[in-house]
């Protein structure tokens, strides 16, 4: 391309007859951008066709959706308060609470005096009630079968068992079958044998017994008031074939005694000086049971048998 053609492209105005290279340089410097752009136009089109598609940016694989909050959520988020832990001392308060208790006023001495008098009355009433308690002063005869059988064969009559429930004495008597006509009575006293009463026993049909013996039962109501100084004793009489056989517990009789409470809560027989009578013969010391003594066990639980002598037990018939 000649200098003249170059100047015509850059500036379409008419040229002089002679064009020098300096004129071309001046025209290039002073020319406007549109002619240059038109001159470089083919190169821009070539670049767009070959490079733009190759350098196209990749699409992101992350699909992020921006969901606008609803108006209600926006209100709740502003109204909801954040939870915080605040200590009392940071608010100027004390970490401890102090309660002051004043001493109770002392009760006057006269109140205590009346309380002691009331306690004395209660103790007296309790003692009076205790003196009315009664227990059997003998073990159940049938618990020692060998002794019971020997006594029965010798005397023809023997107390089999006895119980004391409230104010009633009940029990059974075993007699030897020596005749068809029989009469069995309980002779009992409540005033140390100054007076006594004979109570008839009732025949009981033998279900498991043999033909050599019969069984009778009795029930005796005790008086409502029995002085502690009086003896309560009974024995058994058996009338058959014009003869009278007795069971008086080997001369000691069967006794019912008054009891008192010990500090450990156990009932025991009242001392002789308290009951105003003494015993004519010494008592044999008996084995102790979990209830304190065999006599006590018979009084508290008369329907229970004591098995303190297992070596003497045998089948009863």
Swiss-Prot record:
One of its GO terms (cellular component) is protein phosphatase type 1 complex. A motif (PP1-binding motif) lies at residues 84-87. Keywords: Carbohydrate metabolism, Glycogen metabolism, Ubl conjugation. Ubiquitinated by NHLRC1/malin in a EPM2A/laforin-dependent manner. Pfam families: CBM_21. Changing residue 250 to A: No interaction with EPM2A. GO terms for molecular function: glycogen binding; molecular adaptor activity; protein phosphatase 1 binding; protein phosphatase binding; protein serine/threonine phosphatase activity. Disulfide bonds: none annotated. Residues 149-257 form the CBM21 domain. It comes from the Eukaryota. Residues 141-263 are annotated as: Interaction with EPM2A. InterPro entries: CBM21_dom, CBM21_dom_sf, Pase-1_reg-su_3B/C/D_met, PP1_3C, PP1_regulatory_subunit_3. The N-terminal region is required for binding to PP1, the central region is required for binding to glycogen and the C-terminal region is required for binding to glycogen phosphorylase, glycogen synthase and phosphorylase kinase. Interacts with PPP1CC catalytic subunit of PP1 and associates with glycogen. Forms complexes with glycogen phosphorylase, glycogen synthase and phosphorylase kinase which is necessary for its regulation of PP1 activity. Also interacts with EPM2A/laforin. Acts as a glycogen-targeting subunit for PP1 and regulates its activity. Activates glycogen synthase, reduces glycogen phosphorylase activity and limits glycogen breakdown. Dramatically increases basal and insulin-stimulated glycogen synthesis upon overexpression in a variety of cell types. This is Protein phosphatase 1 regulatory subunit 3C. It comes from Homo sapiens. The lineage of its organism: Eukaryota, Metazoa, Chordata, Craniata, Vertebrata. The gene is PPP1R3C.
